[in-house]
From Swiss-Prot:
Keyword vocabulary terms for this entry: Amino-acid biosynthesis, Cytoplasm, Diaminopimelate biosynthesis, Lyase, Lysine biosynthesis, Schiff base
PROSITE patterns xref list: DHDPS_1 (PS00665), DHDPS_2 (PS00666)
Organism: Ruegeria pomeroyi (strain ATCC 700808 / DSM 15171 / DSS-3)
Family membership noted in the UniProt record: Belongs to the DapA family.
Subcellular compartments: Cytoplasm
CDD domains (alphabetical): DHDPS
Record-level Gene Ontology MF annotations: 4-hydroxy-tetrahydrodipicolinate synthase activity
Signal peptide: none
Protein name: 4-hydroxy-tetrahydrodipicolinate synthase
Amino acid sequence: MFKGSMPALVTPFRNGELDLEALKRLVEWQIGEGSTGLVPVGTTGESPTLSHEEHETVVAEVVKAAAGRVPVIAGAGSNNTTEAIRFVQFAQRIGADAALVVTPYYNRPTQRGLIAHFTALHDCAEIPIVIYNIPGRSVVDMTPATMGALAKLPRIVGVKDATGDLARVSQQRASCGADFIQLSGEDATALGFNAHGGVGCISVTANVAPRLCAEFQQATLAGDYAKALDYQDRLMPLHEAIFIEPGLVGAKYALSKLGLCSEEVRSPLTGLEDSTKAAIDAAMKHAGLL
């Protein structure tokens, strides 16, 4: 259903407003370069700084531009269950193929609270839901046992795992079953993630290097890890450079170098230090992008 290289899309801005023309260009470019899905309004899409109206506009524009050519997994997370229900129901109404729902952040629910939250979202709509487990940002870590309980619900179909713990893939295969879709949320470890049983990556770097990331994923899914390692060596400096500062800022800077969108971000994020720009430039050259 969902596999391969799927960019966690940036949200382009110009003069403080959504740049929808740039967003459409990005969607066309991503599909043309081989991305197998699109994931708007996640962390990399600056969802914390989007109004509800902007959030819904971005999802609607991406669904419209994709036009069914690749699946769209719409960001729909919140630390407020009622608000998350709104986002999931909107994603369904507008025609998204699935919703990506982060574990609630800041208010630190228990595992029982996580089950209640995701069960409510499962029951509110008919589209598949992908859990987004990123304890480094949300503070709450969904355990494999909790995920296994949720995987029994028919529309809880997978996880974007950004724990950085490769053992989790095997643990979650045991608790959720081999058909549960496991997608890496961390570019640098995506090779190992797939070797453990993952089937793709919701990627920051794929914003900038979609063809390379898509071909890397194709190699891993074909079991050609020698070829995948060649791609990994080419991409690793870029994975690292993009995340010297917040990854979405690095991705937008790199996209600006390619002429695809402005590097503008919303406060409290700021533009990159010159040293970070130089590192990204060098990594893009190493990857053959410049």
